[in-house]
Design a protein with these regions (language model features):
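A generic local structural motif
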Residues: 44-47, 89-93
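Hydrophobic/aromatic beta-strand patches that form the interior of the parallel beta-sheet core
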Residues: 2-4, 59, 104-106, 136-138
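A conditional alpha-helix N-cap/helix-loop micro-motif detector
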Residues: 38-42, 85, 154
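Conserved nucleotide-sugar donor-interacting segment of glycosyltransferase catalytic cores
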Residues: 73, 77-92
Length: 168
């Protein structure tokens, strides 16, 4: 089991430095000719892509922040949404290359969205895009909306998690 703590571990964000490093490599530059920072960012980016590809199962847990996924989760998704590695372009459109994997997305929401929020749809959409067809979702919802039911809502989520765990 490999655990990534997105706010503790180094997750490179796509920025000007990373883009210019990739551009230099595409133009024929040697990896060692890039700045040390570019080399580190590109190496880490590739390491995270390879880690994702090597995993049999993917579990993503996040809170809904301002009706979206946390920014570090978006940065991680950039490392697993890579043309030529996790998907390819065909004459019929993009095709996912990551097959035979399962994913579980666990998300806590202060309100109740029943999977209709943008964040959970984005997570499932990106995983489907790269070829992961089985994406189970577990929502821990409504605790901010109805704090008097917090224990009950948490127990319901734990029961659902136990049921999902049997087939995951």
């Amino acid at each position: 089991v490999t655990v990534l703590e997105l706010y503790r571990d180094d997750i490179p964000e796509i920025d000007e430095e990373l883009l210019s490093g990739w551009e230099a490599l595409r133009a024929g530059a040697e990896f060692t000719s890039l700045s040390e920072s570019q080399q580190q960012k590109i190496a880490r980016f590739n390491e995270l892509t390879d880690q994702f590809l090597a995993a049999d199962k993917i579990v993503i847990a996040n809170a809904l922040w301002n009706l979206n996924i946390p920014t570090k989760l978006k940065a991680w998704f950039d490392t697993v949404n890579v043309a030529g590695k996790t998907f390819r372009y065909t004459e019929n459109g993009p095709e996912g290359l990551v097959t035979g994997k399962k994913a579980l997305h666990i998300q806590s929401n202060g309100g109740v969205y029943n999977g209709q929020d943008f964040a959970s749809q984005y997570v499932k959409g990106i995983l489907n895009f790269v070829g992961i067809d089985q994406v189970d979702q577990l929502f821990i919802e409504g605790i901010d909306y109805d704090p008097d039911r917090a224990d009950e809502l948490m127990q319901n989520a734990l029961d659902k998690a136990a049921a999902l765990g049997k087939s995951f």
